[in-house]
Amino acid sequence: MERKGRWKSQIIAPWFEAIFHNFLLSGDFNIEEVVSNQKSEIIRCGTLSVKHPENSASNVLAALGEHRDIVEEIIQQNLSKIQQERLRGAMSHLFTGGGKRLRAIMPRLVGDAVGYGHEGHYTLGACIEIIHNFTLVHDDIMDQDPIRRGLDAVHVAYDNATAINAGDAMLALGFEMLADSPHIQDGQLRDVVSAIGEMVRHVAEGQQEDFEFEDRVSVSEDEYISMIAGKTSAMFETCAETRAILAGADTNAVANMADWGLNLGLCFQIMDDYIDMTSDTETLGKPAGSDIVQGKRTLIAIHALESGADLPTFRKLFGTESTDTDELPVAVKELRNNGSIQYALDRAMEHHRIAHRCLDKLEQTPAVNLLRDMTDFQLVRIN
């Protein structure tokens, strides 16, 4: 609804806007026609979305495609600074495996939404993408994961020592890029560097918590949320926060966008846990429910373990590292019947709603609508 007078600065519930526009303004309506006409508008009533699910994905992917090449060129230009050939190869390795570059492009999208998007946002996005890949290189060593993005992990393609060195160099290169950029003002640089440094620290803390969870008899839901807030969500939070800083947003807007990024990241990670249980082996590239045999303390597993329910197959397989996956569908069915899988989806939806409320505080523009599509994209991944 158009916001005038006393309503101009107010937050209007999305479900009321949908009802007002589509039902109250017209004397009669056809629900099928309403649904079929929703090409870009988000209509949310609880967990119901009367929006073609492919639209969020296509809008986000189109935006990523528009900006991706620019960010990719900045990344490659900076990697070319590395004169030692083997080190440069190790640092560049994961970038040859593709990826959507969501974190790399988010700065420009947020900049457009809250103020003034400019070239500095591309540099910032490239910086965070390189630092993100540094964390992946080190994570794969610590977890001894052999594959990343369909490629041999860096420590497999090269060796452990080179991979560690490459990760360290990527972290250093990210900060060097920021300092050298002519598009980032000196007054903003301090805040940006501080935020990214804090992000890296939170990622490390989250990773350490994840390690320690493996040897714990029990992990609470609050502890799990704290862990993924550091290991996963901190990067989304910092992407949004630093973009707002470079766009010249005020303190309240910066904090609001940081909150949006945090909840986007929490939704992203919980949906990953959900998808592992509900998708198929062909899509995942691994058996559905493999988190069970790996003993991962996901929100689904925590809910199941704390429920007191029998769940014999789940409890038998949990943490066994078994390569026999024949019983996994039975364990997944137990989790579904117990409500553990639905519980995780409900929590993801909760963070999805909070993220949208953050966007409700902004002037509603095409750039903000794209951030809404990015928020919905986290849920569209289940379709």
Where are these regions (language model features)?
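Hydrophobic packing residues in well-ordered alpha-helices of helical domains and bundles
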Residues: 57, 64, 68, 121-124, ...
